[in-house]
C-alpha cells in the first residue's frame, strides 16, 4: 500500500475532504502553464477523485493558484481526466463543482453501477487495470470493463475445472499449450544457436508472435519498459514469442554487441518478469511464477559476431498476469489516500455477490441489497423469505408522511422532554422551518453506529427532512469543547455507513450542529454548523421518495448483522434483524440494567445477546474482559468466545470457586432454562457481581426459553412472576416451513402437558408464535436398524457434500453424550470408507465435529441436522428434547429412530 502525502485528508469534517493543494484553473491559463506542472496537478486531482469514488464519495478542495472573481471552469484536461474515470459520458452523474472565493470544490458521488443500466459495470473505479491481452498482431490494454469480464471468465473456468486441490487447473491446458507453442514456426528460430544479420524469417507477426527492434545505447531500459506489457498480454491470451531484435518486416537485425552483452539481456528480462504481479483463482503452488524461457541467440554478419537476438517464450497463465499493480486509489481518515494492491483490487473487481455460490439463495432468501448496483464497499444483504423487507421495516420504524414532521420514537421524545425542561423549545426552534420529514431521536447515535458513547450527551437527533440534507443535532446539558468532535465523528460514520453499508447511491452528506441547554444563543456556540463548505442543492432530499430511499439505507445500517450464510458461501453476507429484535436491542442500557428475554426456538436470542454485548462495550467504554457471557454447554461457549466480544464460560466454570470474577462488571446469560443449582446459586452470584458498583451497576440480561428445558432439576431462575422486566421474542426466523410446522406441534404438546419444573404461565408465549413462511425444506422421521442408519446418513451426507455443502453445515446429534461416544466411530468409519473409495480427501469432508449430543448443541444451528434416536431418559421432557433437536435445523431435519432387528416399516413425514 502506497500513500500520497501531497493529498491531505481533513479530519475535522463530517465527510471525506481531500485538500489537493494549489491548482491553476481555466482553459487558457492552464494551456500557458508548464506541461510538467500541469500534469502533476492533473494527477493529484485524478487520484483524489478516484479515491473518493471508491470510498463513499466526498469533496476535493482546491486552492486556486490564479485569483479570479469570475467563475472558472476547471480546464479541458482536468475535465477529461475525470470523465475517463467514470462509466458515464455525463460528468455531472458523479461530479459537481463550485467556486467560493479562492477555493474550488469538486463534489464527488460514490461509485456505483446504475440499476437502470442492464450492462454489468466493474465494482470499483480504476484509472488503469495493468492487464493486457493479444488481439491479432497487437498488444491491447484492457479497460475496466474488459478486465472485469476477463477475470470473471477466469474465475468461472477455475471453479468448473475438473481438478482437485493437489493440482492447479493450469496443469491440464498447459500440456496443450506447450505443444501449440512448439508447433509454432517461431519455435525453430527459438531453438537456434546462431542467426544471420539481415535474414528474413519465414513468418510474420501474429497473435502469438511480436517483433521489436532497437539498436540504441538504451537497449536495457527499452527492454524494461516493454517486457511487462507484452509478457502480460501473451500470458493472458494463448502464450507466444517476443522477439527483440527483429523489425516489422521479419528481418533479423539484432542488438549490436557494443550496446549490450548477452548476460545483461537475460538478467534484464528475468528481473522484469519476476516483478510482474500475478493473481491466482486456483490452488497453484507456483503462486508468483510466470512460466517462460529466455534465449539469447548470436547474430553474425559476414562471419563476424554482430550482436544478439533475444527471444522470450511465454506460456499461457492459468489465471491473471499484470504488467504492474492496477492503478486505483482509496481513502480514509486514518490512512489518507492510498493505492490498492493487486490482490485487493482483483477481489473487489470480481466481487459479484453470493448468488452464483448457492442455488438455494434466491429460493430461500430475498435480496435486500445487491452488489450489482451498490457502492464498492457494500456487502450483499439478504433476508429469509417471509420476513419484513427493508421497505416494510422502513415504513414500520421510520414512516414519512406528507406535510408532517414527526418525532420518533415518540416514547423517547416524551421521556426526554419530561427530564429536560428547555429541550422541547430548543429543538422546535431549530427545526421550525421544516414541514415534512422525521426527527429520529436516540440517547446516543454513536452507540447505534457502534461508536463509543459520550456521557455528557443528553441525546442525538437525526433530521431527515424535505429540501434539506440530513442534519445530526447533538444536545448537551453544558458547554463541552469535545462536543463538536463527537458530533462530527458520529455524522461522518453515519454518512459512510449509509453509503458503504446501506448501499445509498444518491448524493449524501450529514450536516452537524451541537446544541446546549444551558446556552441562551445556540447559534453562537461551538455547536454552530462547523462545515464551511456550501454543498450544492443536489445534496438536499428533494421529495418523499428520496427520503424513503435514504431511510431504507438507514434500516440496513441499524439492523444488519453478519449472517451464518457467510461461512457457507465463502463471502460476507448480511442479514437484517426483525423489528421485534431491533426494539429489544434499542432499549436504553442505563435504564434497563436487568432484563429477562423469553424467546421461542429460533427467534434469534443468541444474535441479540451478541449484539447487546457490542452495545455494552460502546455505552460503558469497557474492554471485552469486563463483559462475561455464561451458557451451559461448551460448543456454544466456544462459538461466542471466537467472536472476541467478551469472555465466555460455562455455568460450571462460573460457579467454580477458583474462577476469578473481580474484573467483570456486565453479564449476559444465554440458554438459562438449562442451568442448574448443583454447584450453587448462579443467579445470586451473577446479580451480586453486576450490582457490585452501587453508583454504576452493571448489566445483567438473561435469555431463556422454557420450552427447550432439557432436565427436571431446579434451574436457579427466579420465580416467573419475579422475572421483571421481561421481553418476548415470538417470531421464529431460523427454520424452513416444514420444520417450523413440526416445532409448532411440539410446542403445543409441551403447552398442553408441561413438565413440573416449567412454570405454566411462562408457556403462554406460544399464543404469539409466528414464523416467516416461504422457505422450502425437509422434515423426515424414519425407523432403521443401527447399521442401516449408518448407511442412510452416509448416503445423505454424500449427496449434500456433492451439492456444495460442507461438513460445517451438518450436525449428527445423539440423545446423550454417552451414545455419541459409543456410536460416533461407526459413522466416521463408513464416511471415510466412502470418501477413500471415491479418491477424495476424507479429512476435508468428514470429521468428529459433526457429531454431538442434543443437549450440548443447544444454542447452535446447522443447515442439515440428523437426530439419532432422540428418546429422553426422563419421559416428561421427551417433547422438549425433540423440540431442542428440531430447532437446531435450518433447512433439512432427519429424525431416525432405532427399529427392532426384525425390521419395522419406515414412516416418513412430509
Swiss-Prot record:
Pfam families xrefs: B3R (PF17057), SLFN-g3_helicase (PF09848), SLFN_AlbA_2 (PF04326), SLFN_GTPase-like (PF21026), UvrD_C_2 (PF13538)
Domain notes: Shows a pseudo-dimeric U-pillow-shaped architecture of the SLFN13 N'-domain that may clamp base-paired RNAs.
Organism listed in the record: Mus musculus
Keyword annotations: ATP-binding, Cytoplasm, Endonuclease, Hydrolase, Magnesium, Metal-binding, Nuclease, Nucleotide-binding, Zinc
Signal sequence interval, chain numbering: none
Enzyme Commission no: 3.1.-.-
Cofactor: Mg(2+)
Active site annotation, chain numbering: 205, 210
Residue span of region N'-domain region: 1-354
Identification of the protein by name: Schlafen family member 9
Amino acid at each position: 500500500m502506497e500513500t500520497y502525502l501531497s493529498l491531505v485528508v481533513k479530519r475535522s469534517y463530517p465527510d471525506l475532504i481531500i485538500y489537493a493543494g494549489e491548482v491553476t484553473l481555466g482553459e487558457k491559463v492552464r494551456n500557458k502553464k508548464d506541461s510538467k506542472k500541469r500534469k502533476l496537478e492533473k494527477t493529484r486531482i485524478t487520484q483524489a477523485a478516484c479515491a473518493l469514488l471508491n470510498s463513499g464519495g466526498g469533496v476535493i478542495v482546491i486552492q486556486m493558484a490564479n485569483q479570479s472573481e469570475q467563475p472558472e471552469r476547471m480546464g479541458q484536461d482536468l475535465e477529461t481526466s475525470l470523465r475517463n474515470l467514470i462509466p458515464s459520458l455525463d460528468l455531472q452523474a458523479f461530479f459537481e463543482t463550485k467556486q467560493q472565493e479562492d477555493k474550488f470544490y469538486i463534489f464527488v458521488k460514490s461509485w456505483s453501477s446504475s440499476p437502470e443500466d442492464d450492462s454489468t459495470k466493474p465494482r470499483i473505479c480504476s484509472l488503469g487495470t495493468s492487464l493486457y491481452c493479444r488481439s491479432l498482431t497487437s498488444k491491447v490494454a484492457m479497460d475496466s470493463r474488459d478486465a472485469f469480464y476477463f477475470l470473471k471468465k477466469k474465475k468461472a473456468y477455475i471453479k468448473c475445472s475438473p481438478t482437485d486441490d493437489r493440482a492447479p487447473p493450469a496443469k491440464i491446458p498447459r500440456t496443450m499449450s506447450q505443444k501449440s507453442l512448439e508447433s509454432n514456426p517461431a519455435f525453430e528460430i527459438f531453438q537456434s544457436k546462431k542467426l544471420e544479420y539481415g535474414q528474413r524469417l519465414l513468418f510474420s507477426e501474429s497473435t502469438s508472435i511480436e517483433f521489436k527492434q532497437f539498436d540504441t545505447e538504451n537497449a536495457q531500459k527499452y527492454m524494461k519498459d516493454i517486457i511487462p506489457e507484452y509478457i502480460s498480454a501473451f500470458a493472458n491470451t494463448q502464450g507466444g514469442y517476443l522477439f527483440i531484435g527483429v523489425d516489422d518486416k521479419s528481418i533479423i537485425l539484432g542488438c549490436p554487441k557494443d550496446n549490450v552483452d548477452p548476460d545483461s539481456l537475460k538478467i534484464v528480462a528475468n528481473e522484469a518478469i519476476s516483478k510482474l504481479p500475478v493473481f491466482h483463482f486456483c490452488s497453484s503452488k507456483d503462486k508468483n511464477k510466470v512460466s517462460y524461457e529466455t534465449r539469447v541467440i548470436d547474430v553474425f554478419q559476414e562471419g563476424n559476431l554482430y550482436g544478439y537476438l533475444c527471444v522470450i517464450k511465454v506460456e499461457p497463465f492459468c489465471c491473471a498476469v499484470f504488467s504492474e499493480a492496477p492503478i486505483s486509489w482509496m481513502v480514509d481518515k486514518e490512512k489518507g489516500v492510498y493505492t490498492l494492491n493487486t490482490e485487493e483490487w482483483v477481489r473487489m473487481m470480481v466481487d459479484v455477490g453470493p448468488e452464483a455460490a448457492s442455488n438455494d439463495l434466491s429460493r430461500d432468501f430475498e435480496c435486500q441489497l445487491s452488489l450489482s448496483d451498490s457502492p464498492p464497499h457494500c456487502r450483499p444483504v439478504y433476508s429469509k423469505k417471509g420476513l419484513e423487507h427493508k421497505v416494510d421495516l422502513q415504513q414500520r420504524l421510520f414512516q414519512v408522511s406528507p406535510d408532517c414532521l414527526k418525532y420518533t420514537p415518540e416514547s423517547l421524545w416524551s421521556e426526554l422532554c419530561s427530564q429536560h425542561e428547555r429541550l422541547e423549545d430548543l429543538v422546535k426552534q431549530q427545526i421550525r422551518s421544516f414541514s415534512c420529514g422525521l426527527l429520529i431521536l436516540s440517547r446516543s447515535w454513536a452507540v447505534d453506529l457502534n461508536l463509543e458513547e459520550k456521557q455528557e450527551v443528553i441525546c442525538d437527533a437525526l433530521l431527515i427532512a424535505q429540501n434539506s440534507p440530513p442534519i445530526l443535532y447533538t444536545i448537551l446539558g453544558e458547554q463541552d469543547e469535545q462536543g463538536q468532535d463527537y458530533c462530527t465523528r458520529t455524522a461522518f460514520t453515519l454518512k459512510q455507513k449509509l453509503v458503504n453499508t446501506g448501499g445509498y447511491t444518491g448524493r449524501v452528506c450529514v450536516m452537524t450542529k451541537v446544541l446546549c441547554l444551558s446556552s441562551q444563543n445556540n447559534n453562537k456556540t461551538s455547536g454552530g454548523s462547523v462545515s464551511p463548505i456550501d454543498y450544492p442543492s443536489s445534496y438536499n432530499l428533494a421529495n418523499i421518495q428520496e427520503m424513503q430511499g435514504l431511510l431504507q439505507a438507514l434500516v440496513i445500517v441499524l439492523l444488519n448483522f453478519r449472517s451464518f450464510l457467510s461461512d457457507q458461501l465463502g463471502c460476507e453476507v448480511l442479514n437484517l434483524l426483525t423489528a421485534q429484535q431491533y426494539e429489544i436491542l434499542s432499549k436504553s442500557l442505563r435504564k434497563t440494567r436487568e432484563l429477562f428475554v423469553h424467546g421461542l426456538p429460533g427467534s434469534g436470542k443468541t444474535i441479540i445477546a451478541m449484539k447487546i454485548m457490542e452495545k455494552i462495550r460502546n455505552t460503558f467504554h469497557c474492554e471485552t474482559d469486563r463483559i462475561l457471557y455464561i451458557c451451559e454447554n461448551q460448543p456454544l461457549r466456544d462459538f461466542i468466545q471466537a467472536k472476541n466480544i467478551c469472555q465466555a464460560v460455562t455455568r460450571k466454570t462460573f460457579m467454580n470457586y477458583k474462577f476469578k470474577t473481580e474484573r467483570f462488571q456486565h453479564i449476559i446469560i444465554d440458554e438459562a432454562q438449562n442451568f442448574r443449582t448443583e454447584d450453587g446459586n448462579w443467579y445470586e452470584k451473577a446479580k451480586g457481581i453486576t450490582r457490585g458498583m452501587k453508583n454504576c451497576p452493571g448489566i445483567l440480561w438473561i435469555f431463556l426459553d422454557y420450552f427447550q428445558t432439557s432436565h427436571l432439576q431446579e434451574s436457579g431462575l427466579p420465580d416467573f412472576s419475579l422475572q421483571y422486566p421481561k421481553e418476548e421474542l415470538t417470531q421464529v426466523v431460523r427454520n424452513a416451513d416444514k420444520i417450523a410446522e413440526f416445532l409448532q406441534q411440539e410446542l403445543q404438546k409441551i403447552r398442553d402437558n408441561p413438565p413440573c419444573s416449567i412454570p405454566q404461565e411462562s408457556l403462554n408465549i406460544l399464543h404469539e408464535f409466528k414464523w416467516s413462511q416461504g422457505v422450502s425444506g425437509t422434515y423426515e422421521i424414519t425407523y432403521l436398524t443401527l447399521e442401516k442408519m449408518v448407511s442412510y446418513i452416509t448416503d445423505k451426507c454424500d449427496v449434500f457434500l456433492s451439492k456444495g455443502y460442507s461438513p460445517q453445515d451438518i450436525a449428527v446429534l445423539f440423545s446423550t453424550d454417552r451414545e455419541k461416544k459409543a456410536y460416533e466411530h461407526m459413522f466416521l468409519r463408513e464416511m471415510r470408507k466412502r470418501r477413500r473409495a471415491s479418491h477424495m480427501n476424507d479429512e476435508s469432508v468428514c470429521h468428529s465435529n459433526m457429531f454431538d449430543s442434543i443437549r450440548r448443541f443447544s444454542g447452535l444451528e446447522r443447515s442439515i441436522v440428523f437426530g439419532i434416536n432422540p428418546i429422553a431418559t426422563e419421559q416428561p421432557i421427551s417433547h422438549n428434547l425433540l423440540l431442542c433437536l428440531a430447532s437446531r435445523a435450518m433447512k433439512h431435519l432427519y429424525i431416525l429412530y432405532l427399529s427392532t432387528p426384525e425390521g419395522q416399516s419406515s414412516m416418513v413425514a412430509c
